[in-house]
Amino acid sequence: MEIGISHYLTVSAILFTLGVFGIFLNRKNVIIILMSVELILLAVNINMVAFSAFLNDITGQVFALFILTVAAAEAAIGLAILVVFYRNRGSIAVEDVNMMKG
């Protein structure tokens, strides 16, 4: 049995669905929301690489590499903000983050 593009798209759809459900079902924990966003970005990357390989074009793979770098920067900045917020407030609940004024 050969692994075709439909297998990659199925895995990507499952990851995307898990990410969306993670955001909508768990709105209290900011870390879970960040992890769900990372799952969604990973699903997009799998789609881009799968279609890039299917169409014999390298553009999708280059875009996937750019998305990975942006996702890594987003995760690092998001976690750094959460660490500072936890040190100041003692909690990382979404309700407490919504009360920030600046």
Curated annotation (Swiss-Prot):
The keyword Heme does not apply. This is NADH-quinone oxidoreductase subunit K 1. NDH-1 shuttles electrons from NADH, via FMN and iron-sulfur (Fe-S) centers, to quinones in the respiratory chain. The immediate electron acceptor for the enzyme in this species is believed to be ubiquinone. Couples the redox reaction to proton translocation (for every two electrons transferred, four hydrogen ions are translocated across the cytoplasmic membrane), and thus conserves the redox energy in a proton gradient. Belongs to the complex I subunit 4L family. Keywords: Cell inner membrane, Cell membrane, Membrane, NAD, Quinone, Translocase, Transmembrane, Transmembrane helix, Transport, Ubiquinone. GO terms for cellular component: NADH dehydrogenase complex; plasma membrane. It catalyses: a quinone + NADH + 5 H(+)(in) = a quinol + NAD(+) + 4 H(+)(out). The chain crosses the membrane at residues 5-25, 31-51, 65-85. PANTHER family: NADH DEHYDROGENASE SUBUNIT 4L-RELATED, NADH-UBIQUINONE OXIDOREDUCTASE SUBUNIT ND4L. It is found in: Cell inner membrane. GO terms for molecular function: NADH:ubiquinone reductase (non-electrogenic) activity; quinone binding. One of its GO terms (biological process) is ATP synthesis coupled electron transport. The lineage of its organism: Bacteria, Pseudomonadati, Pseudomonadota, Alphaproteobacteria, Hyphomicrobiales. NDH-1 is composed of 14 different subunits. Subunits NuoA, H, J, K, L, M, N constitute the membrane sector of the complex. Its EC number is 7.1.1.-. InterPro entries: NADH_UbQ_OxRdtase_chain4L/K, NUOK/Mnh_C1-like. The keyword tRNA-binding does not apply. It is a multi-pass membrane protein. Coiled coil: none annotated. It comes from Sinorhizobium fredii (strain NBRC 101917 / NGR234). Pfam families: Oxidored_q2.
